[in-house]
């Protein structure tokens, strides 16, 4: 599921990834949510508490489906935008590719 934020991970800098693109599965309706962050644990906690986004707030609970390490925030925003343009089937294939 979630890659280790260790140095050497794809997109990792000396202290680990500078940013993450993540996909959440909303268990209420099995929808997928894509976002980016520089602090994955904090962002997941926000989503799970209902403070993350309007979209996930109404579809709790959520689970992390995939997390992709990114070298910087700009790369994370671009990858988020690219993933948001994918079809559901393409997003599910991307999730299935993750370790």
Language-model segments: what does each one mean?
Residues 1-84, 88-99:
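GIY-YIG nuclease catalytic motif and its immediate N-terminal context
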């Amino acid at each position: 599921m979630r890659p280790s934020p260790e140095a050497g991970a794809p997109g990792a800098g000396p202290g680990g990834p500078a940013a993450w693109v993540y996909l959440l599965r909303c268990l209420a309706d099995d929808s997928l949510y894509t976002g980016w962050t520089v602090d994955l644990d904090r962002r997941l906690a926000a989503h799970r508490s209902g403070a993350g986004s309007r979209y996930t707030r109404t579809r709790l609970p959520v689970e992390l489906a995939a997390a992709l390490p990114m070298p910087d925030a700009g790369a994370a925003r671009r990858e988020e935008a690219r993933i948001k343009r994918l079809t559901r089937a393409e997003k599910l294939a991307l999730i299935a590719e993750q370790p």
